[in-house]
Swiss-Prot record:
Subunit structure: Homodimer.
Binding site for heme 3: H45
Claim: NAD is one of the keywords in the record: no
Molecular function terms, GO-annotated: metal ion binding
Note: Acidic tetraheme c3 is not a subunit of this octaheme cytochrome c3.
Role description: Participates in sulfate respiration coupled with phosphorylation by transferring electrons from the enzyme dehydrogenase to ferredoxin.
Processing and modification events after translation: Binds 4 heme groups per subunit.
Chain positions recorded as heme 1 binding sites: H42
Any one biological process term the GO annotation gives: anaerobic respiration
GO CC terms, sorted: periplasmic space
Protein name stated in the entry: Cytochrome c3
Organismal lineage: Bacteria, Pseudomonadati, Thermodesulfobacteriota, Desulfovibrionia, Desulfovibrionales
Amino acid sequence: SETETKAASIEAETVLQFPVSFKFNRPEGRPTALFAEVKFSHYDH
């Protein structure tokens, strides 16, 4: 349905923006490695 398509679009937009936001807001330590993992899987597709 149109509603489901819109929801999927919003979700995809959030997924694409999240790594960028996380890059600038991440604390030191383990989350840095998590970000690298997310970034790698993003470009792997």
